[in-house]
């Protein structure tokens, strides 16, 4: 993994760990403070998380984007220079908003996909590909809530959320 930077914060009895793999000059204190209301929103929405710890494990890269949910963690890939730097304004630029949205999306999956799921995902036949018709609802609902959660926690304005919906 190389250089790893870890920060921990607590929300409603759950410890959240923000791990960056790769060098960063980002304002990690700000990122943690921005993630706190987002995590609380999700915990309140689903009446808590059965796990005591949740991990945001982020591979910082030059150019790349994505996430993969797990039961108590997510593996993220995000460009290092799109995170907020120390001494920047409190305004959330679009690129940083995408990081918060990605975190929101993958955390939402801790319930919607990892705990709320169809039978085919509970006991999958791993000897062959498994197709399901419900994937659109899992990704669709999660995609709806990732940015909606940013608006509900006031990390972005209602106007910004309306612009996202318009895209």
Regions found by a protein language model. Give the residues of each.
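Juxtacatalytic substrate-recognition/specificity segment
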Residues: 8-134
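Acidic/His/Gly-enriched intrinsically disordered linker/tail segments
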Residues: 116-125, 129-167
């Amino acid at each position: 993994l190389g250089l790893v930077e870890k920060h921990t914060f607590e929300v409603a009895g759950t410890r959240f760990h923000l791990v960056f793999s790769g060098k960063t000059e980002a304002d990690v204190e700000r990122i943690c403070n921005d993630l706190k209301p987002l995590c609380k929103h999700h915990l309140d929405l689903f009446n808590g998380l059965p796990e005591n710890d949740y991990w945001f494990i982020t591979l910082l890269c030059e150019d790349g984007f994505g996430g993969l949910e797990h039961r108590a963690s997510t593996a993220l890939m995000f460009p290092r220079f799109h995170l907020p730097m120390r001494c920047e304004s409190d305004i959330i630029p679009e690129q940083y908003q995408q990081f918060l949205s990605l975190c929101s999306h993958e955390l939402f999956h801790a319930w919607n996909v990892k705990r709320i799921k169809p039978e085919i995902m509970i006991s999958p036949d791993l000897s062959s590909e498994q197709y399901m018709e419900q994937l659109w609802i899992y990704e669709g609902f999660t995609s709806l809530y990732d940015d909606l959660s940013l608006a509900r926690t006031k990390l972005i304005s209602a106007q910004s959320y309306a612009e996202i919906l318009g895209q």
